[in-house]
Each structure stands twice: as structure tokens, then as C-alpha cells.
Amino acid sequence: RSTLFPYTTLFRSYIPKTIHFIGSPAYEDNGTMVLGTAEGGMKITLYNVNDINPDKIDINLLNEYYFQTMHHEFAHILHQTKNYDPAFDRITENAYIGSDWYMVGANRNAWQQGFVTSYAMSESREDFVENIAVYVTNTEDYWNNMLQNAGESGRALIKQKFEIVYSYMEQTWGINLDELRDIVLRRQDDIANGNVDLSIIE
């Protein structure tokens, strides 16, 4: 059974000292919802937390809007501290579409273009951290299904980029993403099964 012990020093050193909760949603100029922001490694802000109902836990909603966002923003802090191999940026460098990413629609529409989510198509840094966030918050079956439905070219691009991501996390930070995923999914199950009482969290 995996534990967080190997990562204690890392998390204590780099986890933001402030996690800021905003009850209402935030929006970009293009109308897309902002799920979270990271500010200089010191603060992570999560929006729309008034939608969380501790008496009726929807683990899929928590995963999409909060857990995945936390891993996304924390990954930004890591690469801002120690940058990743710039070869990652060149793999799909001509496919990034900036603020028009939302026009891609559902994530599965991005898979065949070599991206794990539509938002990953906005720019290379977002692409990099989306790989981490999606991998550790979803099951192996989800990941394999994504690769299967990405088609030959999309699958090859995702695998090529993820190899750099996986190596970066392991060699730079000593984080094994498979082990971290086991921990994250176990704790998600604890919440979904009522083994964590969210109503007493202050």
C-alpha cells in the first residue's frame, strides 16, 4: 500500500502556504470558467466552492473541479521552480491555439490531436501540467481508453510528451507518478465511500 512518506519533504517545501477558497465562479474574457490559479508558488485559489455539498458528495465533480485543479496548479509551481525539458514544447508546437482552446469542445476532441484535454491545447506549459493532473486523478483504464481513442497519430504524440513528463517528475523531484496515482485514487475512494467526514473540515 502506497504512502506519502517519500514526498513529505517535497510537499512541505513547495506546497503553497495559502489555499484561498472563493465561493463564486470566476470567468475569463472568452466566457470560460476559471477553476483555479497559482500565484508565485505562494497561493493557490480555488473558485466556485459554494457548489460543494458535504452531505451529497459527487466524487466526479470534486475530481474535475478541485482535485485535478490542485494537481494542475501544484505542477505549475514545480516547473516554475525547476523547468522541464524544452523538447516537450516542440512536440506539438504548431498545434497550440491560445485562448481559443474552448472551441475544441470535449476533451476527446483533443485526444486525436495529441492532447490529454482541450485546455492543454492553450499553450505548452498548460499542456505539461495537464498531463500530470489527468494522469494522477484518473484510473489506468481511463488513461488507456484515452490513448485507444486518440488514434495512431494522437496516441504517439501523447506518449511522446508523457515520457518527458514522467521522467521529469521522477528524475527532478523523485516522484513516481504511478505511485502517486495509487495514493490519490485511494483517497478519492475514501471520500466517495464516506470514510472522510468533510462536514467537520474547518
Regions found by a protein language model. Give the residues of each.
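Active-site-flanking segments in enzyme catalytic domains
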Residues: 19-202
